[in-house]
Amino acid sequence: MSMFIRKEIDLGSGKTLSIETGKMAKQADGSAIVRLNDTMVLATVVSSKTPPSPNQSFFPLQVEYREKYSAAGKFPGGFFKREGRPSEKEILSARLIDRALRPLFPDGYYQDTQIIISVISSDQINDADVLGGVAASAAIMVSDIPFQNSMSEVRVGRVNGEYIVNPNINELRDSDIDISIGGTENTICMLEGEMDEISEAEMLEAIRFGHEAIKKICALQNEIAAEVGKTARTFSAAKAPDNLRQSIAEICSNELKELAYMPLCKEERAEKTAEIYKNAKAQTLQRYQQEITPEVIAAEPEKALYLNEQIIGDAIHSIEKQVMREMILDDAKRLDGRRLDEVRPISIELGLIPRAHGSALFTRGETQALVTLTLGTKKDAQMIDTLTDDADKRFMLHYNFPPFSVGETGRVGGTSRREIGHGNLAERAIRKVAPAESAFPYTIRIVSDILESNGSSSMASVCGGALAAMDGGVPLRKPVSGIAMGLIKEGDRYAVLSDILGNEDHLGDMDFKVAGTADGITACQMDIKIDGLDYHILEQALEQALHGRLHILDKMNEAIQEPRTEIGKYAPKLTTIQIPVDAIGMVIGKGGETIRSITEETGAEINIEDDGTVTIASASGEGASAALETIKLLISKPEVGTVYSGKVRDIREDLGAFVEFLPKTDGLVHISEISNERVAKVSDHLKPGDKVKVKLVDVRKDPRTGKTRFALSIKALAEKSADNGASDKAEANR
């Protein structure tokens, strides 16, 4: 029978975080509820007890984070009125939790494991994502699932120089830091966030501050786990016996070492590595197949490992990893021959996509991003509806990673979680220097298509995104660049790597992406695979990243120093004016008739805000100007001598035609003012619904009714046209 336990901790600033277990979801292997004010998160974990396949070599961990609309007393949108597939926010939150938890499961634990985090209550000011990380860790800690250490996640903000743990959305609006930190009592294992160009020292200070809160929450989890008192289940990690690994090393370690010291391109290295793997497997199997017969395996089942191709492949991989790490630590030499702090060669080309509003091809080594800019109007903004925010998103960056970029075939279709995560990081990096809506009222969409990848494609998207925006005339406050840092650590020896390759990411201990301007950091993301990362290593990584960023910015400045003064040739031209609030109805017209008419005549798109801000968009400057003039006329007072576009409302055969020349304002075109020729019947010249240009020739008040009467003329315009024609003819005859 489950035991109910509830404990809480004071986070400061009047915030109390509580963890409870033993009340809900008791059939899961572990469950926990974390609460901060009225935001509550339920996390459950279930890990299969069926042994994994002997050939399995990965940990099938699935983390799902879902925000229930009922948690905030809301109805989901759509016809079915129920939650559907995960939103982008839910996917990003799930990744945040997954990345912090995954390194803490023991090596060789390959049981199918599923963690489901559900937001069951939301006060709509406290985001639940980092609470989900705490709840997930607590659920594992009270289960029998093997887990190395409790993990906690916090968000750190800074308002007026004061650091805050788990700032609410109101505090975040005034904060210059928004960073999520995941860690254990001993170390930091995950970072992700955005900042207003803060220094490396300030970044470290924020991490230290957050880690202190993490230690307290981890201690709380440990207390609860001790009271529950479950013993971790045992498991058998299938790995190569020592003498098998030694035999494999004798076969392939020298070849792998020789290959490591060859500065080859990615494709050549992959081909030669595959050949070494193939030969080493064949020689190993040949060596043991005669010795280990079915009878031997029946007597000693563990001997089957000597003939397991997956186990042999894993052993070769571990030798390859060891060779690369020793080369870096012993000789300060990398797979492609670079120094530890050296950035790969960079090339940049701008404006190569003729119809895009801005474009850049950014190539760094064997990583290449084709980035395009599209500018749109307010109606192109993305509508965001989450538990804590309802807003229009007017800056977005989308990242695409097709399989051909790594020389593979694969599924092409929906956006993967990885693509969403990488795009979000690049978006946050550039958004910090994007212009305010008041200065640049466009919706901005940047798309990064990765054409080649050998590490650090998200940071290539940052650089390419900033370049494409500047090429398209987006007035970024400053250019932004990004770099991915790596780490190799063995005991007290370590090496920090700048601009890591795919292999260095895969075989190394850290992936630390840092983006920013010349003046400070705007975004970061870090994943650590080891326990015990020292702060002095983080400090060195940040300092080395700064030098790398500045080097990349210099290369970007060679291509373009300032945003172009004009937007792209094919981008919509926007004009903004302010009209009185009481004139909004006049511009829109009955049932939208007036605004539709302007759109049809000018080809411009018109958007009107409740405060009277009118934004006019058109593919041509002429269309925007025509729409602007029409709107100005609509809201202006009638002036004698002004020409208006009107619509015939009614005709009187013996009197003339009544024309609506301004919304709800009619004037009379007397029968004598229709044409220079004699008009016998008005209907011979005009019909109700006809659109005509008229000139206001007189305004007077009716002495009997007191109403203002407007006298209009079509003839006056014809006379003016004739006069201009005669003048032109006379000029030509001179």
Curated annotation (Swiss-Prot):
Ranges where the KH domain occurs: 572-631
Species in which this protein is naturally found: Prosthecochloris aestuarii (strain DSM 271 / SK 413)
Residues annotated as domain S1 motif: 641-715
Summary of the function given for this chain in its UniProt record: Involved in mRNA degradation. Catalyzes the phosphorolysis of single-stranded polyribonucleotides processively in the 3'- to 5'-direction.
Main location: cytoplasm
Uppermost EC category: transferase
Localisation: Cytoplasm
Binding site for Mg(2+): 505, 511
Name this protein carries in UniProt: Polyribonucleotide nucleotidyltransferase
Gene assigned in the entry: pnp
GO (cellular component) term, any one: cytosol
Disulfide cysteine pairs (residue numbers): none
Cofactor(s) annotated in UniProt: Mg(2+)
Recorded catalytic activity of this chain's protein: RNA(n+1) + phosphate = RNA(n) + a ribonucleoside 5'-diphosphate
EC number(s) stated in the UniProt entry for this protein: 2.7.7.8
Gene3D superfamilies for the chain: GHMP Kinase, N-terminal domain, K Homology domain, type 1, Nucleic acid-binding proteins
GO molecular function: 3'-5'-RNA exonuclease activity; magnesium ion binding; polyribonucleotide nucleotidyltransferase activity; RNA binding
